[in-house]
Amino acid sequence: MDNSVYQVYEDEIQLLEEEIKLLSDKYEDIQQESTFFSDEEVLMSVKLFQREFLEEHKGHGPPLDLKAELESLQRDLSFLVKFTGIQITSHSKKTLEKTGNRTVQKHRLSGNCQSLPFSLEFQLLEVQNKENVSAAITDLSIAIESGQHSELSKFVSRAEENGNLLMFFRNLSSYAEWCEHRRCTFLHFKAKYPNIVTLPEGQEGDHIILRNPQLPGFELMIVWKMHIDEEGTTTPVLDLLPKVPQQALEQKKASIDNAPACFRSMLLLFGIETAIENLIQVVGLEK
C-alpha cells in the first residue's frame, strides 16, 4: 500500500477527531445549561441533536462514548424529577449586561413541585476571573399559589431575602412531599371508611372529620398542619378537636378533655397513620 493511501486514512482520522471534539464541546454546553430547562425541552434538544448528527454523518455511527453520555443525561434528568418532585415546565432568560468579564442575565422559571405550582424570577451575575467563574443571585422573586398553604408565606419571604435557590428548592421539595403524604393518607382513610371520613376542603385540605352515623352531633376533627422553621425544615403538626353534644359533654367531660392529649401520645408511639387508625377503632367508629 503506497503512502498516498495512508495519507487518505490519516486525513479521515483527523477529520473524525475534530468532529468528535466539536461534538464533545457542544455536549458540555448542553450539560452546563440543562439545569435551566424543563425535562421536555432537554429531551427534545437531545433528539434534535441526534437527528441532525445522523443526517450529517450517514454511514458513520455516532461515537459510542458520546451516545452513552447523552443517554446517561436523560436517565439522570428523569431520576432527579422523580427524586425531588420538581419539574420545570418553562424557562426564559435575557441578557441585561455583558461587559468584559461581567455578565448579568434575567431568568424566569415556572414549574411544579409535586402538585404545588410555583414561578420565580431572578438576576444572575457572573464574573469571569482568571481561574474560575463566580456567580451570585440577586432580585429573587418567588410566587407560589399558596391557597391552603398559608404557612409558605414566611418561608418564601426568607428565601427571597437570602437569594439561596438551592435551599429554596430543597426545602420546597420536603414541604411538598409532606403535603403529598397528607393527601394520600386522607384519601386512604376516606376510601376505607367512606361513611365515616369526610374531607370538607377536598383532598388538598388540612383536616378530616370523623362522624359516627349512630351518634348524631358527635364528630372528631383531625387537623394536620405543616410547620416550617427558620431553616426551612418542615415538621408535621397534628391535633384532635372533638365536638360532642352537650349531654355527652357533661357525662364524660374528663375523657373528652383528655382526648387531644391522648391522640398526641399515640402519634409519638405509633406514627400518624396508625394513630388515626387506632383513634377510629377506639371510639367505635369503624364500620
Curated annotation (Swiss-Prot):
Coiled coil stretches, renumbered: 1-37
Claim: Coiled coil is one of the keywords in the record: yes
Key words, A-Z: Centromere, Chromosome, Coiled coil, Nucleus
Transmembrane segments: none
Broad class of the protein's primary localization: nucleus
GO BP terms: CENP-A containing chromatin assembly
GO CC list: chromosome, centromeric region; nucleus
Any Pfam family: CENP-P
Protein's cellular compartments: Nucleus; Chromosome, Centromere
Subunit field text: Component of the CENPA-HI complex, at least composed of CENPH, CENPI, CENPK, CENPL, CENPM, CENPO and CENPP.
UniProt function note: Component of the CENPA-HI complex, a centromeric complex involved in assembly of kinetochore proteins, mitotic progression and chromosome segregation.
Family designation: Belongs to the CENP-P/CTF19 family.
Protein name: Centromere protein P
Organism: Gallus gallus (Chicken)
